[in-house]
Amino acid sequence: MSSQTVLVTGGAGYIGSHTVLQLLLGGFKAVVVDNLDNSSETAIHRVKELAGKFAGNLSFHKLDLRDRDALEKIFSSTKFDSVIHFAGLKAVGESVQKPLLYYDNNLIGTIVLFEVMAAHGCKKLVFSSSATVYGLPKEVPCTEEFPLSAANPYGRTKLIIEEICRDIYRAEQEWKIILLRYFNPVGAHPSGYIGEDPRGIPNNLMPFVQQVAVGRRPALTVFGNDYTTSDGTGVRDYIHVVDLADGHIAALRKLNDPKIGCEVYNLGTGKGTSVLEMVKAFEQASGKKIPLVMAGRRPGDAEVVYASTNKAERELNWKAKYGIDEMCRDQWNWASKNPYGYGGSEDSSN
């Protein structure tokens, strides 16, 4: 079990790098492929340092999944037990402006990956999907049985890939596929050595908050303070990235269950936290005041979204351990040690 070799696409990214570290510490061998479009090879070097005696079980190849020949070479030289597929563009706003870029990158890259996997007899897959596939849910908590819809091209790429996975399994039952729908990943490894380092303008709340805290931005813009929530701001299910990484290890182990076909699991905490509650927790963790600018709601933003985690707890034997105080503590630890992310200087900030 412990000497399994796993291909991790997008393994230099935020969630990918944290998952690769947990894989190595769990005794797995990891081969990372990443085109470094929205990530840094520094993350891979730091994962190796954190992995200590397991560092030799990690190798990295810079490649784009759409490059079939390069991917073929990797599969020809290594026998993979399974694949964790993170790679993809993930900025909701950018996907609305550049839909073809998202369909090309996310869908074609995935199809090439699946074809090469099939050609080499590797049919175990963990796919990183997203709670965006629930669209604007009419009620909460979101269960895995909720109707699926997507409000933007990014979400649609996730939804289409989920459908491709279900179709592949229906066509060939020897595939074993787990789709993980993440909610809102935040935090960083407790060492403060790896974390989220978005290129350009962040897409998510916490990188914005941390950039205000370290002086890279003057204030945090809060989109919508007239929702029917406790303080008027949107409510989301924030999950610590280390919990999320552990969820992937649990999913990999579940692929060995002979009863698994194509299964879906939510990965969240099952608790909703408002934007203002999250900001307050970060202020307490960092000792910094976060100035706020109130703005109107963004079109397509849901009011309240949080996960039902019962299925993952029951079938994966996985449950999130960390609360928002630990998430903010670790986010600040990373931000204060790496105010400009992996770039290390102001010119990496846009």
Curated annotation (Swiss-Prot):
UniProt-annotated binding residues for NAD(+): 5-36
Keywords for this protein: Carbohydrate metabolism, Galactose metabolism, Isomerase, NAD
Entries under InterPro entries matching the protein: NAD(P)-bd_dom, NAD(P)-bd_dom_sf, UDP_G4E
Family affiliation: Belongs to the NAD(P)-dependent epimerase/dehydratase family.
Isomerase found in the keyword field: yes
One GO molecular-function entry: UDP-glucose 4-epimerase activity
Required co-factors: NAD(+)
Binding-site list for substrate: S130
Pathway in which the depicted protein is active: Carbohydrate metabolism; galactose metabolism
Signal peptide residues on this chain, from the entry's feature table: none
This protein's name: UDP-glucose 4-epimerase GEPI48
Top EC class of this enzyme: isomerase
PANTHER family in UniProt: UDP-GLUCOSE 4-EPIMERASE
UniProt entry tagged with the keyword NAD: yes
Positions of the catalytic residues: Y154 (proton acceptor)
GO cellular component, one term: cytosol
CDD domains: UDP_G4E_1_SDR_e (cd05247)
Catalytic reaction list: UDP-alpha-D-glucose = UDP-alpha-D-galactose
Record GO biological process: galactose metabolic process
Enzyme Commission no: 5.1.3.2
